[in-house]
From Swiss-Prot:
Gene3D superfamilies: Met-10+ protein-like domains (3.30.300.110), Vaccinia Virus protein VP39 (3.40.50.150). It comes from Vitis vinifera. This is tRNA (guanine(37)-N(1))-methyltransferase 1. One of its GO terms (cellular component) is nucleus. Disulfide bonds: none annotated.
């Protein structure tokens, strides 16, 4: 799996100070402090300063909103010299936004959401329909409690709930004054009959334990996640439009001073309407409120003030890094994934902050990412292994990669793997048929050889790296293809000579040479491979697929020239394909051509 890397600058101002620790203040308009340490020495201390722009773009931003009061004095837990991990205060990224919402019955919320879609919040990863504690009432309870009814003269008559509520709290009928304990007991005694409760039968039903089995703990916890605070956001009602009766005695503390209306939901309105009254709202919203008022003497829709709190987990990786890194620095916003490992290629300017960047990458991509590494040097050795530094997470570099439906175990410390070539490998596999016999000269752990073995007749795979051969053999067994793959561990030229001087030579139809730095230099090994055979014999010459890099202005012409020089053959019909741009001005290419007859019957090249 590959994540493309996009680098972009940002506009947060940066000040370099001296000191040991960095501390975030109440908002990004004040300094945020970081602890940036290496294993050998401390780096300069950085303080980040941001100026709020009154014309910020639509949507949530760390530049907008306020910090909650209990986080005003939060400071970073700074690491001390010698610690490997860089720790920063995640609470410093909590932001509170004041909003207006419409409280509506739960049965109407989705229809109204579609109707008012353009006037709702519509923020990424935030639902327009919000839940708060106490907004859900079971259907059975609603039926028992009933609701207020409108009489024929337009006045509201007493509902079942009002009568029941008075009896629960010992209030008199009519004026609703609280009865003395003696009168209350006397009233209760008169309501009894031979069958038990008469007027209290609803209360008796409420007090009985449920006959159904209680839900499992997992189900109850799942239901709780839908209300209140979750891992990245929380909605709270700050101000109700109207106070009602105190329902704590019947329904619990969550229903203190709420007007009875059954199960409800909040439709979060656009942030533009946060401080506006009803008359200032758009006509579409006012029409909904008027329709509801016209249908009933008591409106079931209600405007409420609420606040939306966004936590550290809400913000994207690039937003966090943009807030933490100095002004003008390019923000690394993506990386390559190899199994559970995130592979960074940090620039020199990022190295003082590598621990910080790795920490954010790990936080924002759990659980699929468990290790973050950075390449410390270019590939120079014959085994093509990279020098990697583990920056965060698990120290193990052994992982499992799934590609083209196959599983590959790799150890990035001892073998080479590039996930960015997955598309090219699939494109190459599409060139093969079920009758092909493939010869992979530089197979590595087998991304091409094993994937091809599922499709073609036979595969011969070779690599110089003994660790790669071990993983190649285990991966072939892992994918149940060991019977179709024969593995070799030798130099590329020796392998080509051994294969094409054996009885297998005439069966080989495809040769893959995926060693972009040096593959073209191995083409001279094909000169004279059939020199001992008769020219009159009908031979099916193999198709060669060779990869290479080119920094030339015309990369195709440059690579074609190198192929002709290596083969000592002028007339070579080559099909070129640009694989990817690996660096500014540097292309990776694939050249495909049928091995010329004049090359295979030429005199052999002597190697000194």
């Amino acid at each position: 799996m590959v994540t493309k890397l996009f680098l972009r600058p940002h506009s947060l101002s940066f000040t370099l100070l001296s000191g040991i620790h960095l501390f975030p203040k109440t908002s990004l308009s004040k300094p945020i402090t970081l602890c940036l340490l290496s294993t050998t020495a401390t780096t300069p201390i950085l303080t980040l300063t941001q100026t709020l722009d009154p014309n910020l773009s639509y949507g949530p931003s760390l530049h907008k909103g306020t910090k909650p009061l209990n986080h005003q004095n939060h400071q970073l837990i700074a690491a001390t010299p010698g610690e490997e991990e860089c720790v920063f205060d995640k609470e410093a990224f909590t932001r509170v936004f004041n909003l207006t919402a419409i409280r509506v019955p739960s049965k109407d919320c989705f229809a109204l959401e579609n109707r008012l879609r353009g006037h709702l919040l519509n923020w990424p990863r935030i639902r327009n329909v919000a839940r708060v504690p106490g907004d859900e009432v079971e259907d059975g309870l609603v039926k028992l409690l009933g609701e207020k009814r409108n009489s024929s003269d337009g006045s509201e008559s007493e509902g079942d709930f009002d009568s029941l509520n008075r009896r629960i709290y010992g209030k008199a009928e009519g004026d609703g004054e609280i009865l003395s304990p003696v009168l209350y007991r006397d009233t209760l005694a008169k309501t009894f009959d031979s069958q038990g409760f008469a007027n209290f039968r609803n209360l008796a039903k409420l007090s009985r334990p449920k006959k159904k089995k209680r839900r499992k703990e997992e189900e109850r916890s799942e239901g709780k996640k839908r209300t209140g605070k979750n891992e990245f956001a929380m909605v709270e009602v700050v101000e109700d439009g109207e106070e009602g009766e105190d329902l704590r005695g019947l329904l619990g503390e969550e229903f203190k001073r709420k007007r009875w209306r059954g199960s409800t939901r909040l439709l979060l309105l656009d942030e533009r309407y946060a401080d506006k009254g009803v008359e200032e709202l758009p006509e579409a919203i006012k029409a909904v409120l008027k329709e509801d008022t016209g249908q009933s003497m008591t409106s079931t829709f209600e405007l409420v003030k609420c606040k939306l709190t966004l936590f550290y987990n809400y913000w994207q990786m690039n937003e966090i890094l943009e807030a933490l890194l100095p002004e003008g620095m390019i923000v690394p916003s993506a990386f390559e994934m190899v199994g559970h490992i995130a592979h960074l290629n940090l620039r020199d300017e990022h190295l003082p902050y590598k621990k910080l960047i790795a920490k954010v990458v790990l936080d924002k991509n759990k659980p699929k990412i468990q290790t973050v590494v950075n390449k410390t040097d270019a590939i120079h050795n014959d085994y093509r292994t990279m020098q990697l530094e583990v920056l965060a997470g698990n120290r193990s570099l052994v992982t499992t990669v799934i590609e083209n439906g196959m599983r590959f175990q790799v150890d990035l410390a001892t073998v080479y793997w590039n996930s960015r070539l997955a598309t090219e490998r699939q494109r190459l596999l599409n060139c093969f048929t079920r009758n092909d016999v493939v010869c992979d000269v530089f197979s590595g752990v087998g991304p091409i050889a094993i994937s091809a073995a599922k499709k073609v007749k036979r595969v011969y795979a070779n690599d110089l790296n003994p660790y790669a051969i071990e993983y190649l053999e285990s991966n072939s067994v892992l994918n149940k293809l060991e019977r179709k793959i024969k593995v070799f561990n030798m130099d590329g030229r020796r392998f080509i000579n051994a294969m094409f001087t054996s009885d297998k030579a005439e069966s080989i139809t495809q040769v893959v040479m995926n060693l972009p730095n040096d593959a073209a230099e191995f083409l001279d090994a094909f000169r004279g491979i059939f020199r001992k055979k008769s020219r009159d014999k009908q031979l099916k010459l193999p198709m060669i697929h060779v990869y290479g890099f080119s920094k030339a202005q015309d990369p195709e012409f440059d690579f074609h020239q190198r192929i002709r020089i290596a083969l000592s053959e002028v007339a070579v019909d080559v099909e070129m394909h640009r694989v990817r741009l690996v660096a500014p001005g540097k292309w990776m290419l694939r050249a495909s051509f049928i091995l010329p007859k004049s090359v295979v019957f030429a005199k052999a090249v002597l190697y000194m």
